[in-house]
Amino acid sequence: MDKKVTEIVEAFAQPIVEELNLELVDVEYVQEGQDWFLRVFIDSEKGVEIEECGAVSERLSEALDKEDPIPHLYFLDVSSPGAERPLKKEKDFQQAVGKQVAIKTYKPIDGEKMFEGKLLSYDGNTITLLLTIKTRKKEIQIPMDKVANARLAVTF
C-alpha cells in the first residue's frame, strides 16, 4: 500500500516539480504513531527556497485533493532533502562520485553493514568506495542489490 501511494504521488508531483524547474528527489509515506505523513523532497542545482517548497506543496495538495488517491488523513510536507541527501536514482549516484557517502547494506560485507567513504565510481551495478580506516585506505566494492540505503555524508 505505502509503495503504491508513493508511486501515485510521484506521478502527481513530477510534472509540478518539472514545471518549476526543480527535481523530485524522493517521496515517503510513513506512519508515525497514529499520524500519516506524506513527505516530498525537492531540490535544484542552486538549492531550494522556502517559497518553492510552498508552491509545490500548494499545487500538489490541490491535485491530491481533487483526485483523492490516499485513503486516510495525512500531513503533507514538502522540503529539501538536506545535506545528507538520499541517493536513490542512478543520477544521484553519478552526481555523488568524488563525494563522501554513507552506505548501509542488507547483510554484512567483510563483517560490516555500515560504510562511509569517498564514492570513487558507480557503474549501475556496483559502488566503489574508498574507506579510511585510521591511517589506512581501503577500496571496497558493494553490489547495488546489497544496498539497503545510501546518502551523502557530511564531513567536518
From Swiss-Prot:
Main location, first listed in the record: cytoplasm
Keyword Cytoplasm annotated: yes
Source taxon at top rank: Bacteria
CDD domains for the chain: YlxS_C (cd01734)
Disulphide linkage map: none
GO cellular component, one term: cytosol
Record's subcellular location: Cytoplasm
An individual GO BP term: ribosomal small subunit assembly
InterPro entries reported for this sequence: Ribosome_maturation_RimP (IPR003728), RimP_C (IPR028998), RimP_C_sf (IPR036847), RimP_N (IPR028989), RimP_N_sf (IPR035956)
Keyword Oxidoreductase found: no
Keywords annotated in UniProt: Cytoplasm, Ribosome biogenesis
Family: Belongs to the RimP family.
Function in brief: Required for maturation of 30S ribosomal subunits.
Protein name in UniProt: Ribosome maturation factor RimP
Biological source species: Bacillus mycoides (strain KBAB4) (Bacillus weihenstephanensis)
